[in-house]
Amino acid sequence: MSTYIFGDLHGCYDEFTALLKNINYNENEDELIFTGDLIGRGPKPVDTLNLITALKAKHPGRIHSVLGNHDLNFLAVFYGYHKAKAKDNLDVLLNAPKLNDYIEFFKSTPLLYVDPEKKIAVAHAGIYPKWTIDEAQKHTNVISKVLKDPLHTKVLLANMYADHPDHFEEQMLSSDLNYWRFIVSAFTRMRLCSKELVLDYGHSDCTVIEAQKDNIYPWFNFGSPFEYKRENFTLFFGHWAALNAQCDREHVVALDTGCVWGDRLSCYALEKQEKISPFIKILFV
């Protein structure tokens, strides 16, 4: 049995299946884990979700994913709280025969996946530097509970698009909308933050070097990586294609290599401890 952790798919079905073939994937033995953003902008979101949901139905213990910002955007569009953009290529999903299955799949998908035996944690954007893995799990469990409640789901999706609060405060209550919003932002939108651990959204078009001139740094420069090392955990994340999967922090692995932007799809072979990034790019004509 092998464990493979995939970077953002974004509906790049052909590259995904080509990479599965490249690693000699055996659905009866191997485990697949995804860093989120299974859909959004890519050419074949229906095929991508059909394959993943079918595999999960057959092998529920071997297929795992976390929610990404594009996955949550799809839920918000479905419920009428956000307008679909043509570039996101969601219309084919919204008109698909299995639409309700996709909605239930994403509503049951957590923000964080942790395997204590394999000593791994997977989150779309990462884990807020102030939190340990146990604390992060507690916070994400709150959102999983929210998404199981029809009314709370609508409240969250209707109000999640805001840049505040931009930092965590211990007095935030589990029933507080600001608390919900911060959890979602930290796990699905986070890239940069200040030394005071204030999340930054104003440097999204800057390089890391440019942001550092304004004393803004990658989230993984702070705090919790040392906690992961102490616990012998490794954290895997996607979301940040501009990094090209370059992260120099021990016990933190970046996996988004920008397949949907014309680059390649990557995965990490856990048992071999190696990143697999063959240049498989399917050209559509």
Please place each PLM-identified region on the residue numbering.
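Acidic, His/Gly-rich catalytic cores of divalent-metal-dependent hydrolytic chemistry
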Residues: Q137-V285
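Active-site neighborhood of divalent metal-dependent phosphoester bond hydrolases
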Residues: G42, V46-L49, A54-S174
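Active-site neighborhood of phospho(di)ester-bond hydrolases with catalytic His/Asp-centered motifs
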Residues: F6-G7, L32-G36, S65-G68, A123, ...
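Active-site environment of divalent metal-dependent phosphoester hydrolases
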Residues: H10-D14, G40-G42, H70-A76, H239-Q246, ...
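A general structural motif
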Residues: E27-D30, P60-R62, V122, N232
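Short amphipathic alpha-helical segments
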Residues: T17-L20, V46-D47, V77-Y79, D134-E135, ...
